[in-house]
Amino acid sequence: YISINVGAFISTILTPWLLEWYGPHLAFGIPGILMAIATYVFWLGRKKFIHIQPKGMGFIRETFSREGLRTMTKLAIIFSFVAVFWALFDQTGSSWVLQAEDLNRNWLGVHWLPSQIQAINPIMIVIMVPIFAFGIYPVLDKVFPLTPLRKVSIGLFVMVIGFAMVSVVQQWVDQGQQPSIGWQIFAYAILTSSEVMVSITCLEFAYTQAPRSMKSVIMALFLMSVALGNFFTAGVNSFIQVPNQLVAATSLNMTIQAKDKNGKKLLSTQEDILKLTSQTKDINGNSIQYITNQEGSYTLILAGKDGTFGTTTDIRLKFSKGGKQIAVKTAEKTNLNTAFVKIKSYFDSNKNTLPKTQAGTDLIKSIIDNWGSPLQYRLVNRNMFRITSLGADKNYMTENDIVLVSTISRPSKDESTKKKPYSWRENRIIELKGDEGKREVVKSRGGIKEIEFDTAIMVGGQTNLEGSDYFWFFTW
């Protein structure tokens, strides 16, 4: 287990760095080559490893015997609780990384990439395994008999403490603060302690408690708990997604701009495009209108909730002749802009600090949308906020919400960051977007003279469990 985590530490440090500076070819190619070498080394030992010959139907008889079924049932009950552990633990590669993007990642004199923080877990495993084996376990065993089940039980409670820690950190982020990454590393220490007590103990327990011919099956049951935990997390994340009304139009636009291998558009005539748009349905089951503009651009119109064109629920997406999205227009444009001005005025008057969610909501609550509901405000982090019209259904967090998302770019005082060479990712952005991409890269580095606000309009497309609420949900 220590050997596995030594490899995990090295790969978790190097892979994000290779991806950032040399691209996916090396970042994923090198691990692929190393896996091939590992397979070859394993093959070289084929004459030294112990080979257990298949026993035919004896395996079936023992597996489905009274003892075999009793063993699997007992372990399945234990592993069902362990599945909850994996539902939380494996989020270190997803929600924890996203949280790290909003934290101050300068730690130990190094500016860490968000994905590199995961390397803390395997290196802590290497340190903590001997500490637990030769220090903590013997001490606890003097207080009460420390059985494998008690180790697992204690580990599950410790996991709750670790996830509560990142929940608190996310609360700070939700309030516009930028906590140190050290807080998340502290949570990693708690999480790793839980892993030592749960994962290692379960691996040992599964092997020692299984009948000789069933060891692989019992190990598979343990690994099934990992899958179940991830299925649960995936199910929650799927359930909390709010449908995005703009997807139908943006997907249609990609089809309109599609070209064959010779660079010729597949839809070459106006009739072809009109036929396609009339057959394409939005999430409400309505067709999409296509209108050409004088300057060569075109507009795709979604009818919205009422299914009728020419009403306040219409959503207009304007695209350039080359297919670049220029604007999203809705009936809420004026209201959202008015609210945006109020939030920006507060920002300018309060030392470049955004209002917290409740303060911002109070600031714009007098602005009423076209359907009689006050606008809503949410602070996402210190550099992002959302202003929302509830839309025609008057319900928050639905596909009819019309949302202005604003992102703040701030000048950086660190001159070395501005002058360092472009990474592979930054060069790729510039290659794909040209001058616009270069501007995007410079802005992300803080190479601008003054604070800038970028805004985008979305219709739906949010998540109805976010921020600290998301982390507290899994904690409880």
Task: Give the role of each language-model region.
Residues 5-21, 164-168, 228-240:
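A gly/Pro-rich, aromatic-decorated transmembrane alpha-helix motif that marks the paired
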Residues 166-197:
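Hydrophobic core of transmembrane alpha-helices in multi-pass small-molecule transporters
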Residues 265, 283, 305-311, 315, ...:
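Acidic, glycine-anchored loop motifs typical of Ca2+
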Residues 2-6, 119, 123, 157, ...:
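Transmembrane alpha-helical cores of Major Facilitator Superfamily
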Residues 2-3, 147, 154, 179, ...:
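Cytoplasmic loop-to-transmembrane helix junctions
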Residues 9, 15-119, 127-144, 148, ...:
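Intracellular loop-helix junctions on the cytosolic face of multi-pass helical membrane proteins
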Residues 243-280, 316-364, 411-412, 417-437, ...:
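Conserved hydrophobic/amphipathic alpha-helical signal-anchor segments
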Residues 195-210:
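Intracellular juxtamembrane helix-capping segments at the cytosolic ends
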